[in-house]
Amino acid sequence: MQLYHGSPSLFDRFDLSGAGEGTGIKYGFGVYLTEVEKSAVHYSQPRHLELQPDHYLYTVEIPDLTPDNHLVSALPVPAPIVSRVEERLGQKAPDKAVAKGKEFRQWIGMTLTGTKDAGFAEEKAAAELLDSVGVLYNVWPNAQVKVTADMDVEAYMRKPKNIAVFNADNVRIVKREHIEIENKYKKWVLVEGSRREVQ
């Protein structure tokens, strides 16, 4: 599966030592990727920093999504994933936790750390446990869509996706490009003709 990542830093491989520094961990601990190139360009500029001198667009590949290798933030957790996690933790997940991928991630993290709030440490702990039982990703639509009871889940999943990859070893860089960006209508966009591949 081909996706994109934007960053002000040039690197040869992904690692999670700086996880959360660019966009935070709202959608879990991991390498944040998107199917939408424009979105990666926008996020090549960290929102909390002054305009950085360099910006890079990464084209990457990850193993394909399968029904039991990812969570979807706003959808119920597949039963095989629930079973593997419950077995690893030695306890049953509450019904509320399995109703949405986000709640499940947070429950795992709080269970592992013994806390009542889900923050950075809890998201990291959840990502490590999920990766250890074959759950590689957290997925959410690029354009946020409210999930309703009568929603067509297949149509929801056909929308362009963002993905948090829990283990950086699952991300392979295919191409790196130095890009220039400019701010248009509060969005960072690619300056036409500025792409230059980096070897």
Regions found by a protein language model. Give the residues of each.
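Active-site and NAD+-binding cores of ADP-ribose-processing enzymes
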Residues: 1-26, 34-37, 44-199
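Active-site rim elements
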Residues: 30
